[in-house]
Amino acid sequence: IEMPPNGDFARSTGPFIPRKEDLENSALFLHNNTGKKSVLLDWSTVNGLKALESMLSGADIFIEDWDYTYRETTGIGREQFTSCHPELIEICITPFGLDGPYSRWKSAPIVQFALSGIMNIIGDPKSDPLMIPGHHPEYLTGINGCNASVIAPVSYTHLRAHETDS
């Protein structure tokens, strides 16, 4: 589910594949999303939120990336969906979690890359931090989110936990 007007940022990220058809042509977007279906939905509106809740009625796992500030601004609480759908597992992908001392902090890919420990093994320790090209922090986040979505059903079965903060 993508937020209008532009949806996934990768749709407008190059390199672009020259095509005659009026189809997606971002190589990054195609690499990450081939075979997937998507819908544009503005869940910040009352009707959009109702549509999202309706979609979640048949879902096992809901993966979102709404940080604490976004939830506070939109009024989407932590129990918003799991209270209506008690079997739903929500994977919350945020830079620093939804609780704790850093939950309200913003982040950037270079910060996440540094915190992953990978920056410790590249570059010169006496120089500025180096960011390797590509979208590695985002991919690492995706891998962790995927792991959480595989582990969460087992946790839910044994502990009845509804939310995993990745």
What are these model-predicted stretches?
Residues 158-166:
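Single conserved hydrophobic/aromatic residue that forms the stacking wall/gate
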Residues 1-155:
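N-terminal helix-loop segment corresponding to the beta1-alpha1 unit
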